[in-house]
Amino acid sequence: MSSKEAPMRAWLKMAGLAMSNKSWLSLGDFAGICAKTPLPMCFVVQTSSLPGGSVGATHYDRTHMNIGMVPRCYSRTVDIANTAIFQLGNAFVNILALCVILIISYNIRFKYTAIGRSEYGYFFQLCFMLICMTLVVDCGVSPPGTLAYPYLAALQIGLAGACSWALAVMGFLGFRLWEDGTRKSMLIVRGVSMVGFLLGSLVSAITFTNWIQHHPDMKTNTTALFVVMYGLNGLALLMYSVCQLVVSIFVLSNFWMTGSTILGVIFITTGQVLMYTISYEICEGVKHYLDGLFIGSICNVFALMMIYKTWDISTDEDLEFSVSISVDGDIMYNSNLKL
């Protein structure tokens, strides 16, 4: 090796080591996310590596204020009837989502003999509660800086975990590992969703409480919160998607179900990617009337619709059966009913 090549190799080695260290240090750091996307939890965490372009790093000293990281651009507040409403566009989408969930729940109740009817009804009840809590923390019912805000944000994260973990368990219903609709089945779904709720809410509450007590230090350890929000919940959604694809292709051979599952994955993935990557560009482009949360919420609504449609398709024909009562009072089942 020549004398000219030695410094170049050493420089490349040092650069690679620095990049590796940077990637390890960025694990669990919400600085890059919160600089672009106004997530509710961003207002109750802090980091020592705020990007220089963020509002919080350049425009004011946050050590004397009871808020965490502020994004560079976020949806403007609207004053209606002497009431400040945050995230107005996102609020309209979430209200629409509540209406969609009510319609879906109504349809689920009338599919009396469908497989997973009770489990999916419970899942959409969790989704309804999650969206209600999202309206509370997003729209300023309890604005950032109040004492209740960190705990409400923790409840929102916990409900998101409950929905994700319940969905993961429901993905196994198509394999008939246990009888659906029974006390055992509901105990499994509710128990797993409760674990997801407790894990998400407790980790969030502990993280936010640590910030409340030490926020003048300008840093919060958010690694556990990052792992729970994006690691475990993402793994649960992946498990559901894989199970539905396996059931639709190899068990039912129903490619309409496969298509609806793939559409749901596309919607949720697209919404998350756009929300975390181009929220700032969206906000600047529409003069602060909307931001990435609006796009993410719309995609989440379509993903919920695809979850219902996937279940609806899977229970449309061969998995339906009729129930009747004979003259002697016996309950008769007919599994050959075609709808």
Curated annotation (Swiss-Prot):
One Pfam family cited in the UniProt record for this chain: Chs7
Principal location class: endoplasmic reticulum
Subcellular location per the Swiss-Prot or TrEMBL entry: Endoplasmic reticulum membrane
Any one GO BP annotation for this protein: endoplasmic reticulum to Golgi vesicle-mediated transport
Spans traversing the lipid bilayer: 84-104, 121-141, 155-175, 192-212, 223-243, 249-269, 288-308
Keywords: Cell wall biogenesis/degradation, Endoplasmic reticulum, Membrane, Protein transport, Transmembrane, Transmembrane helix, Transport
Protein name: Chitin synthase export chaperone
Organism for this UniProt entry: Eremothecium gossypii (strain ATCC 10895 / CBS 109.51 / FGSC 9923 / NRRL Y-1056) (Yeast)
